[in-house]
Amino acid sequence: MAVDPNVKTLVDNRRARFEYDILETYEAGIQLTGTEVKSIRAGKANLQDAFALFRDGEAWLHNLHISPHDTASKVFNHDPTRRRKLLLHRREIDRLRGLVEQKGLTVVPLKLVLNRGWIKAHLGVARGKKLHDKRQAIKERQTQREIQRELKER
């Protein structure tokens, strides 16, 4: 996959790839206020516990923590953990809702990117990993590090 020079990763959810098997990915817009955009551009967002829910034919992102903007007054600042509307096509919402309801999967945000001036969320349709799967991933990562270390020493 070619790297697009117009796309810049602002916030990454590295924990999601460790705790879940990502089956599919989608890109969605997010309905944000001005102070939220400023905080995200400064990298002051946390995707750790965030997830998507589907209600009334709309997709909502819950538990996305965006810190209040430093220079804005408290009157104009936003609620850090309010739910935010995800902007997806109707077919995408219906497909994601079907996967979540039937197969017991979940939708988690993987990262927030700046794409041509717009903040987008990369969402992953995910299945939770079991404890032994997580241990296996740690073992594989350690063996890869050891192999790289050996190759570097040569």
From Swiss-Prot:
Name of protein: SsrA-binding protein
Function: Required for rescue of stalled ribosomes mediated by trans-translation. Binds to transfer-messenger RNA (tmRNA), required for stable association of tmRNA with ribosomes. tmRNA and SmpB together mimic tRNA shape, replacing the anticodon stem-loop with SmpB. tmRNA is encoded by the ssrA gene; the 2 termini fold to resemble tRNA(Ala) and it encodes a 'tag peptide', a short internal open reading frame. During trans-translation Ala-aminoacylated tmRNA acts like a tRNA, entering the A-site of stalled ribosomes, displacing the stalled mRNA.
HAMAP family: SmpB
GO terms for biological process, alphabetical: trans-translation
Similarity-based family: Belongs to the SmpB family.
Family matches, as InterPro entries: SmpB (IPR023620), SsrA-bd_prot (IPR000037), SsrA-bd_prot_CS (IPR020081)
Chain segments carrying region Disordered: 134-154
UniProt source species: Synechococcus sp. (strain JA-2-3B'a(2-13)) (Cyanobacteria bacterium Yellowstone B-Prime)
